[in-house]
């Protein structure tokens, strides 16, 4: 388990005393509760009583780790020399002297102190923890900033102290530590962007060595919830449960019992009904009017009672809960793209998923974390990845952690396909809609409901979805024709470089950087998508026809019995 802490170094005295304190071991013991404990920063982190006689102290970009403070200051002096600033003429010596105190102007940041703590449960050696810290800070800073790292073993939990210079070795620029002030965040709390980047890199490197990466509790990570569990997601979950309850309840009392069983709190006392998820960290109630802009009254008490009058289905609370859990699992496991990932593309695996190597740009590489529930591992250790089109994945750059890039499921599937030469399997969203509606109709039929308003509504929705599928097939056919035309022109362009072909490609919106292989992959993906959608369309139509034949036969038989 890895915990991190960040402290800003503002004063020269926090750096300058390093050499004297390292030479005098008696002065290296400090009281951490003292507000001025950073005064002894460098000697503290390199204290031999804490670092296995200094064996676990190392640095980057400096000659002597025990004189790091002066080397940090020298780097800043070089920057000032190149700019010609902060130098004063000394009349006694007749020379120009650098004004070291100028480094503290405007409460400037001189360095950054990072602490990386590990749990004894991780079963890592001090040497491994030191290496984790070294790799983390190298990747975090891109290797462009001097640093010293010391691993302390004097406590039950081994921890790294890392101090890095705020001045870039190569450019002289200040390290940009970004914090979004509380006035600009939805949570009302400041958000430390750069510390979050550091933690992501720390987790990635530590997990390679087997350290357990735990998620912070809601109380300690409100901002985390505002990122991935936003109010809009709560609304979506509430609406999903309400729509399900409107289908599965017989009257308002039945609705209330089943809503409670699905951890959905409700309050019908006000003008607008309010709802809240009891199994999620939702703090504020959600008004029903905000769940459907076109029909704001849909989830109010009167509308619910009216809607439930059309239901013929009668199920127990336990049956409704069981079916809802199955439905949630189906939705969670649904996907838009299926991509095969070769074992060589996997950086390393953890108990919760794996880090995938992804190339971007000409010579850059990073890792993306993929949750285990999105992966099926094959016998040859390759993996099949299931992605949603619009979900996002954060790319952690190996060269510079401050570089933040997000890939959608669509972009990731495309890039992985180009890398390994496979065609991502694309599934049209309407297929999921058809599957859900067919499942719902079958469920009603299994419980003896094959007529009435409830059944007819489901049937009408299914016919609408089939119409949408038919329209999508038409769009895909046109797309395939267009891509085929472009592919032919690109092949022709490669052979004779005709200006007429180039002009025609430009008219089609195809730039000079587009190659045949790019279009070929997209074309194959569209063809596979068409095949899957067409099969689903034809299969569903056949099932509907068969069902209708059985229903007509049953009705005729029942009429005969009545007569």
Swiss-Prot record:
Q: Which Pfam families match?
A: Relaxase (PF03432), Relaxase_C (PF11083), Relaxase_M (PF20874)
The question of whether Iron is a record keyword is answered with no
Q: Which gene encodes it?
A: ltrBE1
- What residues sit in the active site? 44
What does the record give as the function of this protein? Answer: Mediates initition of conjugal transfer of plasmid pRS01 possibly by introducing a single-stranded nick at the potential origin of transfer, to initiate single strand transfer from donor to recipient.
What are the recorded GO MF terms, alphabetically? Answer: metal ion binding
Cofactor needs: Mg(2+); Mn(2+)
The protein, known as: Group II intron-interrupted relaxase LtrB
Residues holding Mg(2+): 159, 161
Alphabetized UniProt keyword annotations: Conjugation, Magnesium, Manganese, Metal-binding, Mobility protein, Plasmid
Q: Which InterPro entries match?
A: Endonuclease_MobA/VirD2, LtrB_C, LtrB_central
Q: Which domain of life is it from?
A: Bacteria
- Claim: Metal-binding is one of the keywords in the record: yes
What is the additional note? The gene coding for this protein is interrupted by a group II intron, Ll.LtrB. Splicing of the intervening intron is necessary for proper protein activity and, therefore, conjugative transfer of pRS01, as the splicing event brings together the two conserved histidine residues proposed to function as ligands for the metal ion cofactor.
Query: Which family does this protein fall into?
Result: Belongs to the mobilization (MOB) protein type 1 family.
